[in-house]
Amino acid sequence: MTQTLSQLENSGAFIERHIGPDAAQQQEMLNAVGAQSLNALTGQIVPKDIQLATPPQVGAPATEYAALAELKAIASRNKRFTSYIGMGYTAVQLPPVILRNMLENPGWYTAYTPYQPEVSQGRLEALLNFQQVTLDLTGLDMASASLLDEATAAAEAMAMAKRVSKLKNANRFFVASDVHPQTLDVVRTRAETFGFEVIVDDAQKVLDHQDVFGVLLQQVGTTGEIHDYTALISELKSRKIVVSVAADIMALVLLTAPGKQGADIVFGSAQRFGVPMGYGGPHAAFFAAKDEYKRSMPGRIIGVSKDAAGNTALRMAMQTREQHIRREKANSNICTSQVLLANIASLYAVYHGPVGLKRIANRIHRLTDILAAGLQQKGLKLRHAHYFDTLCVEVADKAGVLARAEAAEINLRSDILNAVGITLDETTTRENVMQLFSVLLGDNHGLEIDTLDKDVAHDSRSIQPAMLRDDEILTHPVFNRYHSETEMMRYMHSLERKDLALNQAMIPLGSCTMKLNAAAEMIPITWPEFAELHPFCPPEQAEGYQQMIAQLADWLVKLTGYDAVCMQPNSGAQGEYAGLLAIRHYHESRNEGHRDICLIPASAHGTNPASAHMAGMQVVVVACDKNGNIDLTDLRAKAEQAGDNLSCIMVTYPSTHGVYEETIREVCEVVHQFGGQVYLDGANMNAQVGITSPGFIGADVSHLNLHKTFCIPHGGGGPGMGPIGVKAHLAPFVPGHSVVQIEGMLTRQGAVSAAPFGSASILPISWMYIRMMGAEGLKKASQVAILNANYIASRLQDAFPVLYTGRDGRVAHECILDIRPLKEETSISELDIAKRLIDYGFHAPTMSFPVAGTLMVEPTESESKVELDRFIDAMLAIRAEIDQVKAGVWPLEDNPLVNAPHIQSELVAEWAHPYSHEVAVFPAGVADKYWPTVKRLDDVYGDRNLFCSCVPISEYQ
């Protein structure tokens, strides 16, 4: 039969690239699970009353090249002015060796959070380096492996200050008046829900205020002033007030470490270390504190431990602080943070080393001195005598200066009364400084760079002598070796080789949606049109961004059944927090601020109760029945008991038990009956898109994990994006922003992230995914995800019982394998199976969530039948090994499972095990071998002997 031109054009070609099983493989799997078609399978599994009658209207699919061309045309509407706005964001020079070998490398960006340390030693080492950079520059004892951005780090610092404060009756948090405005915005938002009063005043007036438990200072101040806070911090410490300092990472290369001045907590943005501005993100925040406060710190902390052979190995330390264990009692709701960006900053420091970083910092400061000297020579007044890279210049004709700047395609900071702000950076050249002279003084200024340079080189007083760093930084060998591109390339490759990412094997983590992050989706994030915009540039310079964001928001509205989408939250946890704040403020607008009870099913993600606590709510747990579904009787009882105090319910759909609950609409109706709102966690949206939607089900608000359902890569633990979709009545209560008016959002609320659109530069990934898939492809992706999960469940059911199923014995897009019966019989645990899977070349499924003693498997739609069968065969082979243990062929204490994973060095070491080398490292015919570099980690040793900075190079060898 002759094909039509439309068929030959094949606009849906990407759908077949994204979805792993081809049509023949899909039919084989459908036959295996006993279904006629994808539609028939979906019809059996998804409750009839929530199935969409018509698909969401998000358009037809486009080819990769057509979508890239369309997005390039949109991006070209952005105007790339030279930015001197500052305020925590500067232009950078990302070394090409890091750009090509990390940011553009799926071996780095497709990995998951390092919960399985044996397959994560490379990025754990890079993160440990990041912590070492933080420790050296801040002068403190303990550092985390990144937070979401500087402003949210400030909010975390405030919360931490209250936790560790000895002034238990104090309830006021002091913020210095020269803190960045976006930071103050986020701090105020967080303080409101915690019931803290925020005081903003000149730092020197802090002692005039009573009942203060914590203080936030900025070094360098938002308008450029360097402060010597040594005496002030000493006085605050004598009064038991916890001191936090927001610090500029590049300035710290030259300035005295705040920790040395007595600060308790120091944080800031690592953006200046090689990460483009990207219209606001993503950027990693660094965070450090005194050792005595380590168990109150937020975020991941990488620690040095030992493996089963006694060798040095790295892991995430002190996880008992975190939301997935402590739930509403956690220090923070932060889970995934900004690992990929932290690793870029880490490797930027490795590549430049201390000498290179000092050269960059000194060059920035020298050019700032030259600019200052020239302006003062011509009669202009600087507001601050002490500065690093930012000048606050008083100008009589401010409008004229700004007009000349615009004509020269330059952005200055314009929100300072009777002055302009100018922040220089590592991209600034002497030619740029001459251009600034012309903008501020006119073309006939007569100034010469070399003459000014001679003057300031011998007589610079812009940094107080007491504020100059007098200690060495980055003395560890890792920062003093890899300075040629060859060495750097090989070092990065050596780290990458240690890890298991999607470029090597499927990562079947339940509730994580480790799907394809297509190359075509990733390409636009490094386009200068997207990468080089300042988040506070004039809106007319960001029309491309505005168009792309508006289009993406419109698609998400149609896919979710909501009325509006807010793009600001820069992680799923932030999305939860923002959604719950919208509910809280909605109730307050109706004079029902007393509604503060949040119902949460026992099966919920740990972030749910942690977020509810952060939003000022009380958590009440709703029971689940023996089938894993929400117990409607208990729900009604808890809702009735809460009565007029019921705020909301947080529910995940499909449930975390891997089934579509038949009564989800009834759950919504019960909560609405008692005046509550329904928060539907978007973690499992990959089983909804095109089939049903939160709004159609009856929910009021959801966050969407763009780093799951909509293809933003996990980056080894970030970046993420968690925009929220809301019904119309909640739209006025989504986050706003104090610096930038968000077009189309009639909101009066404070910000939850530093930038108005969160991590805007990764939004093109989701735009590309939706554009290339179209309505047809998006629905098919959800259906194949469901098919793949059911295929795995059906083939493994006899070996590993599936704990929960819905109608007709089906699961949704993931399934829970019950290991408990085997564990009781043989003592082989879910942990042993997880580690043994490494020997078979796989990352483990999710362990012991939501039920202890289980493995939760989510294959996603991107994995082919070949890969699914490889995983299934590995699991069946492991079951056969367990049977060998059960039969007494191998002893309980010495078998391939309890000794897993096995490493290369064991092949040449003395071998005393009752099984062969081949069984250990090439089980069941494994040919394409992934080699872990460490054996099983000793978690107890790591937490009892906490060490979170770089170890000698010899320890890695």
UniProtKB/Swiss-Prot annotation:
InterPro entries: GcvP, GDC-P_C, GDC-P_N, GDC_P, PyrdxlP-dep_Trfase, PyrdxlP-dep_Trfase_major, PyrdxlP-dep_Trfase_small. GO terms for molecular function: glycine binding; glycine dehydrogenase (decarboxylating) activity; pyridoxal phosphate binding. The modification N6-(pyridoxal phosphate)lysine is found at K708. Its cofactor is pyridoxal 5'-phosphate. Pfam families: GcvP2_C, GDC-P. Belongs to the GcvP family. The glycine cleavage system is composed of four proteins: P, T, L and H. This is Glycine dehydrogenase (decarboxylating). It comes from Shigella boydii serotype 4 (strain Sb227). The lineage of its organism: Bacteria, Pseudomonadati, Pseudomonadota, Gammaproteobacteria, Enterobacterales. The gene is gcvP.
